[in-house]
Amino acid sequence: MKLFNKLFQGDKVIWMVVILLALSSLLAVYSATGTFANTKHHGSNTFVLLSHAAKILVGLGAVYIAHLSKYTYYSRLLWLFFFISIPLLIYTLIGGSDINEAQRTISVFGLISFQSSDFAKVALIGYIARELTLRQDNIKDFKTAFVPLMLPVLAIVALIFPENFSTAGILFASSMVLLFVGRINMKYLMTFFAIVFVAMTMYILIVMNFATDKGRTGVWVQRVVSYVESFKDDETKDAEEIAKQENEEDFQIIQSKIAVASGGIIGKGPGRSTQRNFLPHPYSDFVYAIILEEYGLVGGIFILLLYMILLFRAVAIMAARPQSFGGFLAFGLAFMIVMQAMINMGVAVGLLPVTGQPLPMISMGGSSMLMTGFAIGIIISVSKDINNKEKGDELTTTQDNN
């Protein structure tokens, strides 16, 4: 036990959450990749399993390495990452590789590809946490606090927005919550939110009504329309409308709902999913639907609780480090991860339109696994510092009593 505590420092509950998410990922993705293996790897599920296991190990390695450093080290590192992320995002927009008709990845020598937005998300949260800490004395001031904090948020979100609306939305919402927690003037935040909302609405209206090539905006609008249409009673739809539906976005929604409904309370059992053969991307965007089908409501609630525990532990860390870089950083990263998880799960059960967001630490995907692991490692690093301080205080108290 002493060796374990020495090797794995920090919040043991978060460590347990990470390990359980990794094991859940291995089981769910292996089961969900049957059709993918047949079409891409000549039916070799073993290859897919080993490939995904390697990505999980990379993610866990990122957690472990990140947790070793003192969290204050990330103040300068993430500040540097923020300025690196801006040219990376610009390059992604101009020359990024296409994934699902969107330029989201950067390819390095044709061998390795990663999503620059995953890198930028962690960098921006770190930048905000640093600046919030430095500006606490004048945090209510418009010029010295609000403007210097909002401009970086606007820059990163604007660069992600054209090709990845859902990621931009998650990052914007997470940033706004973190700024609220950091005591930025609520009046300024609400005004800024209203301006961004109006600007986004005008942008969508202009593109949809006047642009020849609607690009990703057309995809977003179609997803929302398909989502709304999915709630209509079948009796109100004619045969042509139903046929059209089945060839578009809500085919995914329909198949996901079938997976969820067929899972029941305890599920069909590991490896017994049938909807993995019909769902597009059952190993990434809709992996939660496969979990619900095979492990039922019990399995779904278990995964949900893991993410909620992560958020609660981050809130506890922030409470132990109020108005400090470590507290802001841990909470901001955890909130962003959990919000992404909630959106993925909401899509899988039909509560939200299709977004394309992976389930953190579970869905198959190298860059997402790496950067999520890095973010969780930073959270553990903050908790490690708190634990060390508490042990030091206990030792000092004991010595004083003696």
Model-assigned labels for residue ranges:
Residues 315-356, 362:
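Loop-to-helix entry and N-terminal half of a specific, functionally important transmembrane alpha helix
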Residues 1-21, 27-30, 35-163, 345-358, ...:
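Membrane-helix boundary/helix-loop-helix interface segments in multi-pass membrane proteins
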Residues 79-80, 86, 145-159, 165-212, ...:
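Hydrophobic alpha-helical segments of polytopic membrane proteins
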Residues 132, 174-188, 273-299, 356-373:
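Interfacial segments of multi-pass membrane proteins
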Residues 54-59, 294-311:
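Hydrophobic alpha-helical transmembrane segments
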Residues 61, 69, 127, 219, ...:
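Transmembrane alpha-helix boundary/anchor motif
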Residues 99-100, 105, 191-297, 324-325:
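Hydrophobic, glycine- and aromatic-enriched re-entrant/interface helices and adjoining loop segments
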Residues 144, 148, 192, 328-336:
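Alpha-helical transmembrane segments of multi-pass membrane proteins, especially transporters
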